[in-house]
Amino acid sequence: MRYYLIAGEASGDLHASHLMKSLQTEDPQAEFRFFGGDMMAAQGGTLVKHYRELAYMGFFPVLLHLRTILKNMKMCKQDIVQWQPDVVILVDYPGFNLDIAKFLKAQTQIPVYYYISPKIWAWKEYRIKNIRRDVSELFSILPFEVDFFEGKHHYPIHYVGNPTASEVAEFRKNYSESRADFCRKNGLASGKPIVALLAGSRRQEIKDNLPVMLQVANEMSDYQFVLAGAPGIDDDYYKKFMAASSITRLVKGQTYELLSHAHAALVTSGTATLETALFRVPQVVCYETFFPRVVGYLRKKVLSVKYISLVNLVADKEVVTELVADSFTFTNILYELSRILEGPDREQMLVGYEEVARALGNKCAPDEAAHLMVKLLHSSI
C-alpha cells in the first residue's frame, strides 16, 4: 500500500521513521512519500519537503513566514492528490496537519490517520470538532488522552504505547559505552559530573533558552555543561551563543548517549523532558517566551492544564520544576538546578520518574500502531 506521511519537526521525523520501519514489517510492499526529515528518508521512499522548511513556532515567527507556510500547504495538498496514497498519516504538527486533514476529508476519499494526536487537552479544545469530522483514526501515545478523548468527548481512539518510552528502553538495553569512553570521544573530563543542556529543536527555542542556560553554566565550575545539538541545526548557529561560555561543549547526534552519562539536565519543554525522565536524569524544565509576563498571565487563563511538561502531565502532579515565561530567570534556574544535584529533592524526583515509566507501559508504540493501521486499512478495502 501507499503511505503519505507528514512530520513537521525533528521529533516527528524520529517517531515517523520508526513507524515507517514497523509499517514495512507489517506491509512489505509499502511505498512511502512524505514531508519529513533525514531519519524518514533513511527508511526509503521520497522526501518531498524537509521539516527545516516547515518548523516555525510561536505567533511572530509564524506571522513572518505565513506566505511560505501557505505555499507549503498548497504544495502538500496537490502532491497528495497527484500521488493518490491509500492513507495519509499525520504526525503531530497540528497547525499544518489539521488543515491538510480538513482538505482531504472535503476533497478526497483518502482516509486520514493521526499518529501522535494534537494536544487539544492543553489548549484549543474546540479542535475536537475538526478531529471528529476529518480524522478517520487517532493513535495516541499518552495514556491520559484516553480519558480526555473517550471519556470527555466520546471520540474513540487507540492508545498504542509511548514511542519515546520504546525508543529509550531499546537504546538502554543495547548501549554499553563507558563514561570514560564517552568523555574521551567528546573531549570531556571523565572525573567531572555532566549537566546536559537540551535547549530545543527549533532555532527560535534555542535563541530564547540557550543564552540563560549558558549563564548558569558559567556559575557552576564544579560541573561540565554539555549541549545536545538538535538535528537540522548547524554547529555555527550554536557557536554564536557558545562564545559567551567557553566551558560548554557541543555534541551532535548523541543525545541519548549524553543522557546516559548525565548527572542532571536543563531541558526545554517537549519530548526531551520525557526522554530525560526515562533516562532517570533529574531535570529543570526551562521555557522562555516573548513578553514573559503577558505569556505567564495568559498561560494561567488560557491553558486547560496545570503543567506544560510531559513528565508532570503523565504523572498528573509536579515531578519536575517548570520555569516558564515569567518564572524563567537566571536566578530561578540556578537555584532549582542546585536543588536537584544532591539530596532528598533529587531522590524524590527519581521516585516520580518510576511512576511515569509505569504509567506509559511497555508496548512498542510504532509496532502497535503499524499493526493496527494495516489491519484497519485491509478491513476497509
Which functions belong to the PLM regions below?
Residues M1-I381:
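Nucleotide-activated sugar donor-binding and catalytic core shared by glycosyltransferases
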